[in-house]
Amino acid sequence: MRYFTAGESHGPRLTAIIEGVPAGLSLSAEDINIELKRRQGGYGRGGRMKIESDQVEITSGVRHGKTIGSPITLNVTNRDFKNWEQIMAAQDVEDKIKKQRRLTKPRPGHADLVGGMKYEFEDLRNVLERSSARETTMRVAVGAVAKKLLHELEIEIANHVVNFGGREITSPENLSVQDIRQTAGLSDLSIFDESQAEELRNYIDQIKKAGDTIGGIIETRVEGVPAGLGSYVQYDRKLDAKIAAAVVSINAFKGVEFGLGFEAGKRPGSQVMDEIIWSEDKGYTRSSNQLGGFEGGMTNGEQVIVRGVMKPIPTLYKPLMSIDIESHEPYKASVERSDPTALPAAGVVMENVVATVVAQEICDKFDSDTMNELRDAVASYKKRLSEY
């Protein structure tokens, strides 16, 4: 199972093509739209979310509500395109139009300058349009398909924010996916402890007034994953490595950890490893889950716990200094539409990206031409594990 995305932030539409989804998976546009709506929510979101109300159109790979094994094409129309039609036109246009919305002042923290240098662009909008977080719309759409597949295999996933701009969010250690959905899933801040919500909203409002932005840390948990996904035999087959790569590929994400993560480096081994236990009804389990569900690059049957660090959004209404690429004179960086924070939305992106990697791994490991075949293969594998 693999996918590609295409489209620019202010272009006519965004597109994703997914190949390798088993035939026979029940799938509707509404399944995907639910996730797209979640991505557009959250406290601190601004202008673009008022313009766009994302709705997916499925144009291939699904017939009469079921996947048919061929590539699935997903399209999301950019409603704001009507205001950018000439500026973003595929055909050549007059020079005066080309100069409209031309970007020559790269924004610190964005791809603008390095992208312009790499591809020899005189207009940095060519970089901005594709490097924009708008692309994550389609990663969420792809993730929605993956989550539907995982649900059929009794694998569930959820996320919540555990640190908001340096402020720790209180939550118990042994959180289930259901716990997260019933708390953070109903919060516009995506936090477990709603008693901290009002203080955080005031904090975000202060940041916005100051023309600044904040980041934070998001935790995603996956339940129902059988032991043995991934492999220790080659570096590129380790599933935690694949998840880590996918998470840091999300716009503005700068770090990732599993279980205790970086805290593990501060403790002796006796306080880090999870002791192995066995029982007649559950088979092999662990006494704790400080390694976040991974050993040797493979799932160990415990809950997968992964955290991603999101830097503050680099587009500031109180812009930092930059250099104009035409004149080489110092200027305050260009300002595009921005939000004080996008942590709750980024959590939705991370959740769907992790779901996609897990679904890919399952489809790679097991026979998966059809959903029936995949269900049988997974059930047979779980039975074998239980007898070990």
Swiss-Prot record:
GO biological process per UniProt: amino acid biosynthetic process; aromatic amino acid family biosynthetic process; chorismate biosynthetic process
SUPFAM superfamilies in alphabetical order: Chorismate synthase, AroC
Enzymatic reactions: 5-O-(1-carboxyvinyl)-3-phosphoshikimate = chorismate + phosphate
Annotated binding of FMN, by residue: 130-132, 251-252, 296, 311-315, 337
Summary of subunit composition and partner proteins: Homotetramer.
The family this protein is said to belong to: Belongs to the chorismate synthase family.
Protein name in the entry: Chorismate synthase
Source species of the chain: Lactococcus lactis subsp. lactis (strain IL1403) (Streptococcus lactis)
Taxonomic lineage from the root: Bacteria, Bacillati, Bacillota, Bacilli, Lactobacillales
Name of the encoding gene: aroC
